[in-house]
């Protein structure tokens, strides 16, 4: 009986270890065009004092998605910023323009972003990514530095 339990625990650890190395695909649909960031670098950080969650998905140097949201009963997306190479960029900080859904640990946010400088029309977008785990943000040091007033 003990060997069976040990084998089950070791098997679970092995599967979890392998899964952690598999890339996470963050999908982006921007103005109807699909893009994907394949990365193992999706960092999901819980902010202190009810500040919500920040999701950061980074691919190559010019591929980035950052989502800030809160959840009190329902998900409210506070801010979304994205860059996919140089042709797909945008930022929105208006929760009225963005919706968010969470199923298990997969987040989907969609909405519209204002035009960038030199553009005339708003952009539509949909982003989907998965948080494999969550970390707590390091709180700011409240002890003043030596010599500080």
Predicted regions and their residues:
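N-terminal export and membrane-targeting signals
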Residues: 1-10
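N-terminal low-complexity, Pro/Thr-rich disordered segments
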Residues: 29, 135-149
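C-terminal motif of bacterial Sec signal peptides marking the signal peptidase cleavage site
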Residues: 14-17
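An ectodomain-focused feature that recognizes extracytoplasmic/extracellular
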Residues: 19-103
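Extracytosolic low-complexity repeat regions of secreted or lipid-anchored proteins
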Residues: 83-134, 140
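Short, low-complexity, polar/charged sequence segments that are solvent-exposed and flexible
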Residues: 46-47, 74-75, 127-130, 146-148
């Amino acid at each position: 009986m003990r060997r069976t339990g040990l084998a089950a625990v070791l098997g679970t650890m092995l599967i979890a270890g392998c899964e952690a190395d598999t890339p996470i695909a963050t999908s982006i649909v921007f103005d109807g065009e699909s893009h994907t960031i394949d990365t193992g670098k999706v960092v999901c950080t819980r902010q202190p004092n009810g500040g919500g969650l920040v999701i950061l998905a980074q691919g190559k140097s010019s591929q980035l998605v950052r989502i800030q949201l809160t959840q009190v009963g329902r998900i409210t997306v506070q801010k979304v910023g994205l860059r996919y190479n140089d042709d797909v960029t945008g930022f929105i900080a208006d929760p009225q323009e963005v919706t968010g859904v969470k199923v298990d640990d997969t987040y989907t946010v969609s909405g519209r972003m204002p035009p960038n400088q030199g553009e005339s029309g708003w952009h539509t977008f949909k982003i989907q990514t998965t948080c494999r785990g969550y970390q707590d943000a390091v709180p700011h040091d409240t002890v003043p530095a030596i010599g500080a007033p």
